A protein has these predicted regions:
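A short beta-loop-alpha structural element at the N-terminal edge
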Residues: 1-16, 28
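Active-site rim helix/loop that mediates acceptor-substrate recognition in acyltransferases
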Residues: 27-56, 64-70
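Conserved GNAT acetyl-CoA-binding A-motif
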Residues: 112-117, 140-153
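Conserved acetyl-CoA-binding loop of GNAT-fold acetyltransferases
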Residues: 162-171
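Conserved acyl-donor/pantetheine-binding loop and adjacent beta-alpha core of acyl/acetyltransferases
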Residues: 64-120, 176-181
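Conserved acetyl-CoA-binding loop-helix of GNAT-fold acetyltransferases
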Residues: 124-140, 163
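Conserved beta-strand-loop-alpha-helix junction that forms the acyl-donor binding cleft
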Residues: 118-125, 149-159, 174-179
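Short hydrophobic/aromatic beta-strand element in the GNAT-like acyltransferase core
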Residues: 48-52, 62, 120, 185-187
Length: 193
């Protein structure tokens, strides 16, 4: 099992994994596919921390990370997709982009130059998330990073982070996604010792 740089040939398998979790259920299928892919791409950067684990030619897990202030590499792809959407779809597509940018900026505000941000991790099979995170964390330590940061929201298993040595550094409400209920967001930190 070797930690490798992400190969985009595995993008369809990742989109398929998150399709029902990360997309507006009432939207048409083609838009949902593009929307899910846009979330993944907006968490990728042009650096050496876009990791994958594969087994027998299949993607098992990916993790993408960035340094403080790094911008994602989705721009050209995102703009091309955006230009093909209806006006209503553009609003939804842009809301997703703005949310990710907002949470990235918020997380960067807690970071120093020797910290790393885990932008995303996806596993396609049970047990592979831990395998990948262990390898990625080892890489981050060897690279000299001091702390690992990540953000998440109420749609994820927030208790998992608390139970795995992550410190909650910020809990907030994202007003644009709130209705009768507040939409909660979280920023976590883990010391890389």
């Amino acid at each position: 099992m070797k930690l490798e740089q992400f190969d985009f040939k595995y993008m369809p398998a990742l989109v398929e994994r998150v399709y029902n979790l990360w997309t507006p259920p009432q939207a048409e299928e083609k838009f949902r596919w593009i929307y899910a892919e846009s979330i993944i791409r907006q968490d990728m950067h042009a650096n050496n921390m876009q990791f994958q684990l594969t087994e027998n030619g299949q993607i098992m897990a990916i993790a993408c990370a960035s340094r403080k202030g790094e911008k994602n590499s989705a721009g050209p792809w995102w703009n091309e997709q955006f230009s093909k959407l209806s006006d209503e779809q553009k609003i939804s597509f842009n809301m997703g982009r703005e949310y990710i940018a907002y949470m990235d900026k918020k997380t960067f505000a807690f970071m120093n130059e020797n910290d790393v941000k885990l932008d995303m991790f996806i596993s396609t099979k049970k047990g592979w998330r831990k395998k990948l995170l262990d390898k990625a964390i080892s890489f981050f330590k060897q690279a000299g990073f001091e702390n690992l940061f990540l953000w998440t929201d109420e749609e994820c298993n927030v208790d998992w982070y608390i139970n795995h040595n992550y410190e909650l550094v910020n809990e907030d409400i994202y007003e644009l996604f709130s209705s009768e209920e507040d939409y909660k967001t979280y920023v976590f930190k883990m010391k890389l010792e």
